[in-house]
């Protein structure tokens, strides 16, 4: 069972992400990774086969100052345990990084569609199609691109999207795979389960199926799958 963590706020993101992944180790996994925005406003991905502590050792030496990021522990479903198959995955333009829990049942069909449209896919996973589908649908409006991507997918998903085109935001979506959002005065948090973020907040909202959320350090805005705004009390 995979684990997801995300954070955007006033603190350095990497320690929050690593602590969250360590708190989700009980779910079982074979690889771990994270993505943050570096000072050049491009996506920095660090991932590898093995334990979260291995990932922690790699990122410590980089001293990444980013205050926004997404992270993941993977339990192999499509594709063997490997660095290449570990999350996050990124599209061919390096503009959209994604972590994903769940199983995309029609990924082979969607993979063929992307290849026919000139995309190159490097992993054996079903997840890698997601950032490339967002790229395929993107025309300047990421929410529209995410909407069209979600409507392409058959199966289950909990998704986080990070992009330098929207450097203060994380985009998330959920269907048949758990995702919880935590809010606080020093930022907002995302996780697949409460233990990953309970150290930082006790204000939680469990997303419902077919919801999309746009999260920055001060706010969370919800939409249905057709991008109609949802008011959450």
Predicted features and spans:
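Conserved short alpha-helical segments that host acidic/polar catalytic motifs at enzyme active sites
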Residues: 1-233
């Amino acid at each position: 069972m995979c684990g997801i963590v995300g954070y955007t706020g006033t603190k350095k993101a990497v320690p929050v992400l690593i602590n969250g992944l360590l708190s989700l180790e009980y779910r079982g996994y074979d690889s771990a990774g994270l993505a943050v925005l570096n000072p050049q406003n491009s996506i920095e991905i660090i991932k590898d086969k093995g334990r979260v502590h291995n990932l922690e050792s790699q990122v410590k030496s980089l001293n990444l100052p980013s205050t926004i990021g997404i992270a993941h522990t993977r339990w192999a479903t499509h594709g063997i345990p490997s660095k290449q198959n570990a999350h996050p995955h990124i599209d061919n333009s390096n503009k959209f990084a994604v972590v994903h829990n769940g199983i995309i049942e029609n990924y082979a069909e969607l993979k063929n569609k992307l290849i026919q449209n000139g995309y190159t896919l490097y992993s054996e996973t079903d997840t890698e199609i997601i950032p490339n589908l967002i790229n395929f649908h993107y025309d300047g409006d990421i929410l529209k691109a995410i909407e069209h991507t979600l409507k392409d997918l058959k199966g289950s998903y909990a998704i986080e999207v990070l992009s330098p085109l929207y450097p203060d935001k994380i985009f998330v979506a959920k269907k048949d795979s758990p995702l919880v959002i935590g809010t606080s005065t020093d930022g907002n948090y995302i996780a697949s389960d409460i233990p990953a973020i309970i150290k930082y907040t006790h204000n939680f909202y469990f997303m419902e199926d077919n919801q999309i959320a746009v999260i920055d350090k001060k706010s969370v805005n919800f939409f249905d799958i057709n991008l109609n705004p949802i008011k959450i009390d």
